[in-house]
Amino acid sequence: MSRKQLALFEPVLLVQALTDAVKKLSPRAQWRNPVMFVVWAGSVLTTLLTLAMVTGQIAGSALFTGIISLWLWFTVLFANFAEALAEGRSKAQANSLKGVKKTAFARRLRAPRHDAQADNVPAAELRKGDIVLVKAGDIIPCDGEVIEGGASVDESAITGESAPVIRESGGDFASVTGGTRILSDWLVIACSVNPGETFLDRMIAMVEGAQRRKTPNEIALTILLIALTIVFLLATATLWPFSAWGGNAVSVTVLVALLVCLIPTTIGGLLSAIGVAGMSRMLGANVIATSGRAVEAAGDVDVLLLDKTGTITLGNRQASDFIPARGVDERTLADAAQLASLADETPEGRSIVILAKQRFNLRERDVQSLHATFVPFTAQSRMSGINIDNRMIRKGSVDAIRRHVESNGGHFPADVEQNVENVARLGATPLVVVEGARILGVIALKDIVKGGIKERFAQLRKMGIKTVMITGDNRLTAAAIAAEAGVDDFLAEATPEAKLALIRQYQAEGRLVAMTGDGTNDAPALAQADVAVAMNSGTQAAKEAGNMVDLDSNPTKLIEVVHIGKQMLMTRGSLTTFSIANDVAKYFAIIPAAFAATYPQLNALNVMGLHSPNSAILSAVIFNALIIIFLIPLALKGVSYKPLSASAMLRRNLWIYGLGGLVVPFIGIKVIDVLLTLLGLA
């Protein structure tokens, strides 16, 4: 469930955006956008000319020059309004987050245990490494890791999700976020950041975007727009001596109007708004991007690394069968598997305990009463188990158990090898159980591929995006699930090192890679990936390594992130195409009007049949300003996105925005010309 979305044109935001748009009329603000700075300079110049004509200092039509000046100011104002409205929506989202920061005091413990002596201190004084105690009803004062206790936590202020979540020490659910509320029980938390560096602080700074850095594509497009502006500026400057030589010099007002209509003011005025709105749409999907660069990279991604569990499959693998080795009865295997899983709190571990209970009435036993030592699972060992007196029982992946058995002087039986292959071919995950160096058998864990995921992968393939499934399963299981899900490739028996190596391999081929992760062991790969979406429920290390955080902790969100990134790039490209195509109609309006008196042959270009030279110039300038206003909703919402190949997408956008950019101005300029004529202003 996402946070409540703002309407596109909230009345309060509109009023604030209008105020900010006027404030942005200062030369310092305009200098940041070179294209609009030229329009601003033209507005100032024509305003001065109007005043000079009114006072009789120079000859000319003060009414015509004044109207041109007014609409040039409107052009600048409308561009400012687009940017201010996009920024206002982001600031409104930031203000809703600021309301979460209301923790006044915290219980700072003198020792890392819940019964230690506590001091009440202002939450702002907490530093990295401080230990705090939070109880039911308290607001968590800092980002951190739970080191003791377990509690139900309301994270709706951050994620928008009303259902509470469990946070507890150990495992992947130990990370807590400052500003969330404890609903029950208590937690002892080790603060992981200093004041001003919390996740909430970074969210607020990001969505406010006051000092938003331009992305590489934005910089490249800005350079192109500046180059076009310089070319048209030089071209316009040379027209005055040509017209003067012909005996009928074009006025400065007409030359300024011509320049403004020639340069790409439409995309120049909307470019910043598109970038801000892209990050805002990402937040609307409950994904926090650390920068516009990350959103832009998402649009260029051509390789997706997707975790199998939770992304491709439902992620609730359950033990379905015990397959004993030759010479071992099924009950013995089930008993050993249950013992190895007694302290395993994963869904798979609990399902093994339950299956043993259902099949053979084997009751759970307390690890402490057995005087046993639990061996936890690690990404390196890829197995877990239990030590009871002289018994050493392990369960884990095939390769991990094989290495374990061989290191203890045993061998891997051929019949178990065959059972492993049979389980894997069915798309289930085989776990092998061993006691000492003796293989006892195989546990089959079954998972279900998500409905509709194969069709989504087919869409990504049409867009030129390669999908790679990442799994800890063996190659046979991975191949079976990959075939069922329809992914392009897979990485089986994945370790953190293997993930990192795979990302580097794709990047060496010139590809951009996106992935998700939630654990500390994912941090190196997240740091290496071009688009790294960390889960909000994940560890602090994972969130710091990624350049995006998914507040819903939904690994499938990576596909939506790519869609939003591509939509932002498409919006920018479509409006650039529309802006440049627009210029063609303006040529047919202004060039005959400006130069037909000197070169009568140019009247042949007046294909729109505009009423007079003055009405033609006014119509083009007015249309140039109004089109920015009409395109603001498109810039903020983004163009309609469909998963197509690059060539199909290019053809579609050229038809819609290229042809549209040619046709719309002809119609718009003609309509404005008719209205001006009816009003007697032409």
UniProtKB/Swiss-Prot annotation:
The chain crosses the membrane at residues 34-54, 58-78, 219-239, 254-274, 588-608, 616-636, 662-682. It catalyses: K(+)(out) + ATP + H2O = K(+)(in) + ADP + phosphate + H(+). PROSITE patterns: ATPASE_E1_E2. Disulfide bonds: none annotated. GO terms for molecular function: ATP binding; ATP hydrolysis activity; magnesium ion binding; P-type potassium transmembrane transporter activity. It is a multi-pass membrane protein. ATP binds at D344, E348, F377, T378, A379, Q380, S381, R382, M383, S384, K395. InterPro entries: ATPase_P-typ_cyto_dom_N (IPR023299), ATPase_P-typ_P_site (IPR018303), ATPase_P-typ_TM_dom_sf (IPR023298), ATPase_P-typ_transduc_dom_A_sf (IPR008250), HAD-like_sf (IPR036412), HAD_sf (IPR023214), P-type_ATPase_bsu_IA (IPR006391), P_typ_ATPase (IPR001757). It is found in: Cell inner membrane. It comes from the Bacteria. Mg(2+) binds at D518, D522. The system is composed of three essential subunits: KdpA, KdpB and KdpC. PANTHER family: POTASSIUM-TRANSPORTING ATPASE ATP-BINDING SUBUNIT (PTHR43743:SF1). Part of the high-affinity ATP-driven potassium transport (or Kdp) system, which catalyzes the hydrolysis of ATP coupled with the electrogenic transport of potassium into the cytoplasm. This subunit is responsible for energy coupling to the transport system and for the release of the potassium ions to the cytoplasm. This is Potassium-transporting ATPase ATP-binding subunit. It comes from Salmonella newport (strain SL254).
